């Protein structure tokens, strides 16, 4: 059911008559010029659907992005990326999805050099398991140990919780707002303060 509401919101239709509260990114945090990598690790397709919706959200405001699944993701790709949105699910009791198993076992085995990297992380899980969002939490800890800086605290989703997904959407929108404003009003960006 959340998927329909999410897609309606993307195309501008009301999604049940309530809006997510405005969210501001961490002071000074916003998307930089250049493409955004959207990395997803999915077992059942939910993270892939959300990655596609996030890409569409960015495209709608003129931000170039590309989606890559964790099978294509490696240390070198992350070390050269400057901004990444991670959408990852956890399977069973804290395990990564099959497509992220190699990444988890090899790439995350030790910290990388990711100081220039800025990221957002949406962790999907099920509170019915003891290690809720275990892979998302492990990825977040590894990114921080590698020197990457989060734009906002990790957002955890319990079984496709609509409120958590709205927070994700709002955070992405807040990061994109300065880019959208500059696109809509390019002359204002050039005026001295």
Residue ranges and their predicted role:
Residues 39:
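Conserved active-site segments centered on acidic
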Residues 55-56, 151:
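Short amphipathic alpha-helical segments with coiled-coil-like heptad repeat character
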Residues 58-77:
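A short, well-structured beta->alpha microelement
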Residues 1-35, 45-46, 61, 80-81, ...:
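FMN-binding flavodoxin-like domain, especially the glycine-rich phosphate-binding loop
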């Amino acid at each position: 059911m959340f998927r329909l509401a999410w897609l309606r919101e993307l195309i501008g239709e009301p999604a049940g008559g309530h809006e997510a509260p405005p969210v501001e990114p961490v002071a000074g945090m916003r998307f930089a010029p250049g493409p955004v990598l959207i990395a997803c690790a999915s077992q059942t397709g939910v993270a892939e659907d959300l990655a596609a919706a996030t890409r569409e959200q960015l495209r709608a405001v003129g931000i170039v992005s590309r989606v890559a699944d964790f099978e294509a993701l490696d240390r070198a790709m992350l070390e050269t990326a400057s901004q990444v949105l991670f959408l990852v699910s956890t399977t069973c009791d804290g395990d990564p999805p099959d497509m992220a198993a190699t990444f988890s076992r090899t790439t995350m085995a030790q910290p990388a050099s990711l100081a220039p990297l800025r990221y957002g992380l949406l962790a999907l899980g099920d509170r019915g398991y003891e290690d809720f969002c275990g892979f998302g939490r492990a990825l977040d800890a590894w990114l921080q140990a590698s020197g990457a800086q989060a734009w906002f605290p990790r957002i955890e989703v319990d079984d496709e919780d609509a409120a958590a997904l709205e927070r994700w959407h709002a955070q992405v929108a807040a990061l994109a707002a300065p880019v959208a404003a500059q696109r809509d009003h390019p002359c204002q960006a050039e005026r001295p303060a």
